[in-house]
Regions:
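Membrane-proximal helix-turn-helix segments that form the acceptor-binding/catalytic region
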Residues: 1-21
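Conserved donor-binding/catalytic core segment of Leloir-type glycosyltransferases
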Residues: 22, 62-80, 86-89, 103
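Short, structured helix-loop element that forms part of the nucleotide-activated donor/catalytic region
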Residues: 28-33, 101-126, 138
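Short alpha-helical donor nucleotide-sugar binding micro-motif in glycosyltransferases
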Residues: 133, 141-146
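Aromatic "clamp/platform" in nucleotide-sugar-dependent glycosyltransferases that forms part
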Residues: 154
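Short hydrophobic beta-strand element within catalytic cores of glycosyltransferases
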Residues: 171-174
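Conserved acidic donor-binding segment of nucleotide-sugar-dependent glycosyltransferases
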Residues: 186-187, 191-198, 207-212
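A short, well-ordered alpha-helix in the C-terminal region of glycosyltransferases
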Residues: 200, 207, 214-229, 235
Length: 257
């Protein structure tokens, strides 16, 4: 868990009865338990607006050539695992790889990771693409049009770009070291690969590339996952429950207030 060993000395060893701890999913909970195993931690996941109900300009993805488009978004840093995604793409059989398009979006905070992506783009210029930055309306349009989201993070409490994909009914392939992995039902609303292993990610990618119609059929299940865990209403319900447990106040009185 990135960072926790370095801040453990700043985290209280005990909590008073009026202090409750909430975490954004199972991965963040496990991270805290790695340094404070006795803490009782509740789940409280953020809520995102329903971007699918908004209007925004269409972002041009013609470079994908009508092929399934696999997208990852985030600053280039070791924690985000762009190198794992690069290696997985290289491991695909040529006849499989050429049936898809891959887009990396993010600023190059780590030069070695940017070099890995640049090399991949150079080797497969008709298949792999890079954009340093997209504006918010472009991201929304991209999520609406892409086929699948890929999150290869080595440590990621709850990646928001994966959630944004769910808003538009898009399945994801995520590392087990993400908060999203704790909510996905395998093969129903997404896929999880283990051990930060590019070969295991490549296996999921190959299946997804060969079965775009099955990914499309996951749309409603992905949308349901968003509404159940990530919608603004789900967040409001979770926050009210957390406050009720802390104060002993009834849910009815919270709603009235």
């Amino acid at each position: 868990f990135a960072g926790y060993p370095f801040i453990a000395h700043r985290i209280p060893k005990t909590l008073d009865s009026n202090v409750h701890v909430c975490a954004v999913g199972s991965h963040a909970t496990a991270a805290m338990h790695s340094v404070r195993p006795d803490f009782n931690i509740e789940q409280l996941i953020y809520g995102l607006p329903d971007y699918a109900q908004e209007s925004f300009p269409v972002y041009d993805i013609s470079y994908a050539g009508g092929r399934p488009l696999f997208v990852t978004v985030g600053s280039f840093e070791p924690r985000k695992g762009q190198d794992i995604f690069c290696n997985a793409i290289r491991l695909l059989k040529p006849e499989v790889r050429q049936k898809a398009a891959f887009l990396f979006v993010g600023k190059a905070a780590d030069k070695s990771l940017k070099s890995a992506v640049d090399a991949l783009v150079e080797d497969y210029p008709d298949t792999v693409f890079y954009r340093k930055r997209l504006e918010r309306p472009e991201i929304k349009s991209l999520m609406e049009q892409c086929t699948c989201i890929v999150c290869a993070s080595r440590d990621d409490p709850m990646p928001t770009f994966v959630t944004e994909g769910l808003i538009f009914g898009k399945p994801s392939i995520v590392s087990e070291h993400t908060g999203t992995a704790g909510l996905i039902t395998e093969g129903v609303d997404g896929f999880v690969y283990e051990d930060d292993d590019p070969e295991k990610l490549a296996e999921r990618l190959a299946w997804a590339i060969d079965h775009p119609e099955k990914l499309a059929a996951m749309r409603q299940a992905c949308r349901d996952l968003y509404e159940r865990h990530y919608s603004k209403q789900a967040f409001a319900d979770g926050l009210k429950q957390a406050v009720r447990e802390l104060t002993g106040e009834s849910t009815l009185s919270l709603c009235q207030n």
